[in-house]
Amino acid sequence: MKQAVIVDCIRTPMGRSKAGVFRNMRAESLSAELMKALLVRNPQLDPNTIEDVIWGCVQQTLEQGFNIARNAALLAGIPKQAGAVTVNRLCGSSMEAIHQAARAIMTGMGDTFIVGGVEHMGHVPMNHGVDFHPGLATNVAKASGMMGLTAEMLGKMHGITRQQQDEFAVRSHQRAHAATVEGRFANEIHAIEGHDANGALIKVMHDEVIRPETSLESLATLRPVFDPANGTVTAGTSSALSDGASAMLVMEEEKAKALGLPIRARIRSMAVAGCDAAIMGYGPVPATQKALQRAGLTMNDIDLIELNEAFAAQSLPCVKDLGLMDLVDEKVNLNGGAIALGHPLGCSGARISTTLINLMESKDATLGLATMCIGLGQGIATVFERA
C-alpha cells in the first residue's frame, strides 16, 4: 500500500468573527490565498499534476456554498483539470479532507492533493439555516444540537469543576500568547491581507482572537452562558468564534521524494467514531482509541497531542479518559488551543494538524496525535509520524 505524507501545511491567522480583521474578506479568498501559497512554497510541484482539492466547510451556503472548494481553486489559478470537492463532517471537516486524500493515495487513486478547510463564522453564522428534523427528538436528547449544553452534560458526568475549566482556559490563552511572542507560530501562519479597526488595508500576521490579559480573576466574573441557573460553562471557557482557513499539500511519498520535496510527516493511522450526541465532546476518546489500535500503538507512544478545545468542560473529560491528566503540560496543546485561537468549524481539523506537525518538528518528536470532537456525537483522530 502506498504511503501518504504531508509535504507542507499552513494556515491563516485566526480573525475575530465580530468586526474582525477579515470582516471584508470572503471565505473563498481566505482559502485561495493558502492554495496559492502552497504552490509558491513548493515550486518543484507542477500544478497540472494535482488530482483533487478537498476542502472542509460546515455552513455550505452563501459565500461558502456551491462547492467552495472549486470556487477557491479557480480563484487560486489551480489548473482547471484538477478536481475540487467540499466535504462536511461538521467540526472534523478538514481532518476528513486529510483522510480522504490519504485513502486515495493509499489505494492508488492519485498522488497529489491540496486539502484543508475554511469557515467564516462572521459572514455565515454557525446556526444559519439550521433546521433539525422533529423526529430526532424520539431518540436523541433535544439539547444535542446545542453544543454548550452537551459540554455542560459531559463536564457534570466527569465531575469537572468551574475552577478546573477556568484554569484550562487561562492556560490556553497564556500558551497561545507565548507562542505568538516567541515566534512559534511563524512557520505555520501565512500572512494575508485584512483590515484594521479603521478600515485600512493591512497585512495580518498574527492571530487576533488570543486574549493575553485573561486571568482566573477575570474569568470568575463571567456567568454561565448556556445554563444560567445551574451551569459552569462560560464564554471564557468556550472556543472563540473566529474566521480562518488552513491548508496542506498531501502527496504519495515516493512522488514527493522524486521531486525533492520535504516529507514533514507520514500519516500513520486514521479513525472516526461515534458517541451519544448528548455528549458529543467525548468523541475524541473512541476515535483516538481506534486510531491507536490501527497503528499498533498505545497512548504512551505518543509524544505530542493536539486536542481541539471546543470547551474546557469537554476537553478535560477527554484528557482524563485518555490518561493524560498528569501529562497535559508535557504533551497536550503546548501552544494553546481553540479556546484562545478560535474554532472556525471547517478549518480546525487541518489547523490543529498543522500546529501539531510544526510542534513535532520543533520538539524533535516522532509521533503525534490530532483529535477533535464533532457536533451530534462523533470524533475523528489522526496519528502522524515524522519521517
Swiss-Prot record:
One of its GO terms (molecular function) is acetyl-CoA C-acyltransferase activity. It is found in: Cytoplasm. It catalyses: an acyl-CoA + acetyl-CoA = a 3-oxoacyl-CoA + CoA. GO terms for cellular component: cytoplasm. It holds the Pfam family Thiolase_C. CDD domains: thiolase. Its EC number is 2.3.1.16. Catalyzes the final step of fatty acid oxidation in which acetyl-CoA is released and the CoA ester of a fatty acid two carbons shorter is formed. Heterotetramer of two alpha chains (FadB) and two beta chains (FadA). This is 3-ketoacyl-CoA thiolase. It comes from Shewanella loihica (strain ATCC BAA-1088 / PV-4). The lineage of its organism: Bacteria, Pseudomonadati, Pseudomonadota, Gammaproteobacteria, Alteromonadales. The gene is fadA.
